[in-house]
Amino acid sequence: MTAPKAVVLVSGGLDSATVLAIAREQEFICHTLSFNYGQRHRVELQAAAEISRRMGAVEHKRITIDLGGFGGSALTDPSMAVPEASSGAIPITYVPARNTVFLSFALGWAEVLGAQDIFIGVNAVDYSGYPDCRPAFIKAFEHLAKLATCAGLEGRAFRIQAPLLHLSKAEIIREGMRLGIDYSRTISCYQADENGRACGVCDSCRFRKQGFWDAGVPDPTRYH
């Protein structure tokens, strides 16, 4: 029996690397997808390509889109500073509609490939308050995929796989260690320098640091 295909969204960060490892353990033939969307931390794209290669993806695509053309996010607008602490509200590092756009591209590629599974590393526990990281969003997009595609109309429903959705960062790291992931090669920082060194103070860095601490695992992140 031929192994099933899957499209896996890979950013170069800790969560998406873990998701790719999970998909590979489940014996999916993985096609990975990354985006240059105008983010200030584009060095993560190099990590995404390397992670995909090292972890056995059969194909890796990088799509260029300009989400920075709209502004509205500290990740794409250089005039907005990346905050060093959460305010309690939806943070300015939220990129409007980002996961909707990413999943739409993944859905298109999955339909072309004949894949029914799309993996994404969203997390609703240790996250920054992004609305497109919630279970309700994943469920709604899965329903949209059934309505908006030929495959869906023909009864070949798509599954949006979000295996990290209800895990803490520490639980994600422990799972990644079990799967043999080298987290030193991942980049999570919102403003990593050109060498991939993390700032250590943005939300993403703080969640990552705390996750390693809570997991009892030495943090392999390179900081500047």
Swiss-Prot record:
Cofactor: Zn(2+)
Organism name: Nitrosococcus oceani (strain ATCC 19707 / BCRC 17464 / JCM 30415 / NCIMB 11848 / C-107)
Pathway: Purine metabolism; 7-cyano-7-deazaguanine biosynthesis
UniProt EC number: 6.3.4.20
Protein known as: 7-cyano-7-deazaguanine synthase
UniProt superkingdom: Bacteria
GO annotation terms (biological process): queuosine biosynthetic process
Residue numbers binding ATP: V10, S11, G12, G13, L14, D15, S16, A17, T18, V19, L20
